[in-house]
Amino acid sequence: MGSRASTLLRDEELEEIKKETGFSHSQITRLYSRFTSLDKGENGTLSREDFQRIPELAINPLGDRIINAFFPEGEDQVNFRGFMRTLAHFRPIEDNEKSKDVNGPEPLNSRSNKLHFAFRLYDLDKDEKISRDELLQVLRMMVGVNISDEQLGSIADRTIQEADQDGDSAISFTEFVKVLEKVDVEQKMSIRFLH
């Protein structure tokens, strides 16, 4: 299986993905093997249904929101490069990356990009704000029926009240960042990928 994965991924493609995502050659090869095993249609792309077969996503209350993050607007398939680009947001920041070239593009796994990714999970209508209704939807996904609607409403109201600095009864990206400034987002939004 590993040899099949490496033969289908051209060296030049591997180098481009490595440069773009920061993953090592062996990580890319391993993830390519995983990608091809998920690709039930064997057409070089994954569908939402392919992702829903992943047990960790199937049981995650935000699984559908995470799956949607892999698909550009209006698309229903994702190729390997798009798959890797999204996974790169979850790659831990290595010590040697903290002093990267300031003129180069910001790494996909930077604090800022991780925060943008998390914000988009909440901003369901993509209007650059998290409304009370959007916050309620996400909270409902996370807690299910274990908490009453009244309690959830109270949590949403209190969250917005604490985060909302401009009085528009919503949370902007800037306000979202401010709320999370003391949270170790780099650690909490990281998945360990084997080398």
From Swiss-Prot:
It is found in: Nucleus; Cytoplasm; Cytoplasm, Cytoskeleton; Endomembrane system. SUPFAM superfamilies: EF-hand. Ca(2+) 2 binds at D164, D166, D168, E175. GO terms for molecular function: calcium ion binding; calcium-dependent protein binding; kinase binding; microtubule binding; potassium channel regulator activity; protein kinase inhibitor activity; sodium:proton antiporter activity. A motif (Necessary for association with microtubule and interaction with GAPDH) lies at residues 2-6. Its main location: nucleus. Phosphorylated; decreased phosphorylation is associated with an increase in SLC9A1/NHE1 Na(+)/H(+) exchange activity. Phosphorylation occurs in serum-dependent manner. The phosphorylation state may regulate the binding to SLC9A1/NHE1. Both N-myristoylation and calcium-mediated conformational changes are essential for its function in exocytic traffic. N-myristoylation is required for its association with microtubules and interaction with GAPDH, but not for the constitutive association to membranes. SMART domains: EFh (SM00054). It comes from the Eukaryota. Keywords: Calcium, Cell membrane, Cytoplasm, Cytoskeleton, Disease variant, Endoplasmic reticulum, Lipoprotein, Membrane, Metal-binding, Myristate, Neurodegeneration, Nucleus, Phosphoprotein, Protein kinase inhibitor, Protein transport, Repeat, Transport. It is a lipid-anchor. Changing D50A: Does not reduce calcium-binding, colocalization and interaction with SLC9A1. Pfam families: EF-hand_7. A lipid is attached at G2 (N-myristoyl glycine). Changing V143A: Inhibits translocation to the cytoplasm. One of its GO terms (biological process) is negative regulation of protein kinase activity. Residues 26-61, 66-101, 110-145, 151-186 form the EF-hand domain. InterPro entries: Calcineurin_B_homologous (IPR051875), EF-hand-dom_pair (IPR011992), EF_hand_dom (IPR002048). One of its GO terms (cellular component) is extracellular exosome. It is linked to Spastic ataxia 9, autosomal recessive: An autosomal recessive disorder characterized by onset of spastic ataxia in the first years of life. Clinical features include motor neuropathy, cerebellar atrophy, spastic paraparesis, intellectual disability, slow ocular saccades, axial hypotonia, distal muscle weakness and atrophy, and pyramidal symptoms, including hyperreflexia and extensor plantar responses. Belongs to the calcineurin regulatory subunit family. CHP subfamily. Monomer. Interacts with STK17B; the interaction occurs in a calcium-independent manner and induces the translocation of CHP1 from the Golgi to the nucleus. Interacts with GAPDH; the interaction is direct, occurs in a N-myristoylation-dependent manner and facilitates the ability of CHP1 to bind microtubules. Interacts with KIF1B (via the C-terminal end of the kinesin-motor domain); the interaction occurs in a calcium-dependent manner. This is Calcineurin B homologous protein 1. It comes from Homo sapiens (Human).
